[in-house]
């Protein structure tokens, strides 16, 4: 029989990586990571009033919604199999003050939204944030005194707010304000109030990123912000510091961990999952979303493929799920497969 060995066989030791890529069925058979609807958390923005669906110019396809419309959106999400929503309020300017006192109102916008959604769609998870930026007149995540974000007073306030959010029906508290000691304080406050079953998804590594701009428009804080958030968010250059920060949250009782933003920090996703083994999530933030949308709208990229590829990259990096504004769009695509 004629020897049909090729030079390539000698070079590769008869190992050819393309054999497993030769057909659709083989590619599907050996695929290492898959994106499913179970991986999706949908962030939504809540505004006062009723009957409101207000498009956000900087986030094409994303709307601010009044509570009644948010309930309708929750029904749609549940029908598509999306496990959970993450809710963010855009409250009236006259309710915002230096200390974010409206965060401690039991009947504030976010708590009313939680109660309404849980009543109408009890089988969908509700994840709420206790950061003060939607409630402050200066746009910072904590209490501002003398030009400084005061850590301990802010921790006291967000722990109290967490209990109120749990009282309203929140399933998971996701504190994003990056104050030292907040996870332990929230855990103790929740347990003392009888909310042992309410989880904490820590924004364990939230970076001082350029990718948050459209979000700040969505909650109307961009024009309010005095200075920057570099004294409490993590420097984008610091990976080891990020893991140390996450380790403190794990020790204080975090049930889940989050990396924010997502795509620029896939290395942190991987390191955090490897280090702690806790359920790990990435937040595909507003700037990441808008980049894809804007490029697709201009015909520069295939928007659907880019969307799915970036979401799959989070799974490959070790994430158990993703907070993404694409959630409903992706869920509809996956349902057709």
Name every feature range the model reports, one short phrase each.
Residues 2-3, 11, 23, 35-41, ...:
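Alpha/beta enzyme core
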């Amino acid at each position: 029989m004629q020897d049909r060995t090729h030079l390539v066989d000698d070079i590769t030791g008869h190992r050819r990586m393309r054999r497993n890529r030769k057909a659709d069925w083989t590619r599907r058979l050996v695929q290492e990571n898959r994106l499913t609807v179970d991986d999706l958390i949908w962030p939504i923005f809540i505004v006062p009033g009723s009957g409101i669906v207000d498009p956000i110019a900087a986030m094409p396809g994303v709307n601010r919604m009044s509570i009644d419309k948010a309930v309708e959106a929750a029904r749609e999400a549940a029908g598509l199999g999306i496990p959970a929503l993450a809710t963010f309020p855009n409250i009236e300017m006259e309710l915002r003050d230096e200390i974010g006192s409206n965060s401690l109102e039991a009947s504030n916008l976010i708590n009313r939204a939680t109660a309404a959604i849980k009543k109408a769609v009890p089988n969908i998870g509700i994840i709420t944030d206790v950061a003060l930026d939607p409630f402050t007149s200066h746009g910072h995540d904590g209490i501002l005194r003398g030009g400084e974000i005061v850590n301990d007073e802010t921790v006291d306030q967000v722990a109290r707010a967490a209990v109120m959010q749990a009282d309203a029906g929140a399933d998971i508290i996701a504190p994003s304000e990056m104050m030292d000691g907040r996870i332990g304080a929230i855990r103790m406050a929740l347990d003392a109030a009888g909310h042992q079953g309410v989880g904490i998804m820590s924004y364990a590594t939230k970076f001082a990123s350029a990718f948050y701009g459209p979000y700040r428009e969505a909650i109307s804080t961009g024009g309010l912000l005095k200075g920057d958030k570099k004294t409490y968010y993590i420097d984008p250059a610091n990976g080891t510091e990020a893991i140390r920060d996450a380790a403190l949250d794990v020790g204080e009782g975090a049930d889940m961990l989050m990396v924010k933003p997502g795509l620029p920090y896939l290395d942190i996703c991987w390191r955090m999952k490897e280090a702690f083994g806790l359920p790990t999530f990435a937040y595909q933030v507003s700037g990441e979303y808008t980049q894809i949308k804007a490029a697709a709208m201009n015909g520069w990229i295939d928007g659907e493929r880019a969307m799915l590829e970036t979401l799959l990259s989070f799974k490959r990096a070790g994430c158990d799920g993703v907070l993404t504004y694409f959630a409903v769009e992706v869920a509809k695509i996956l349902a057709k497969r």
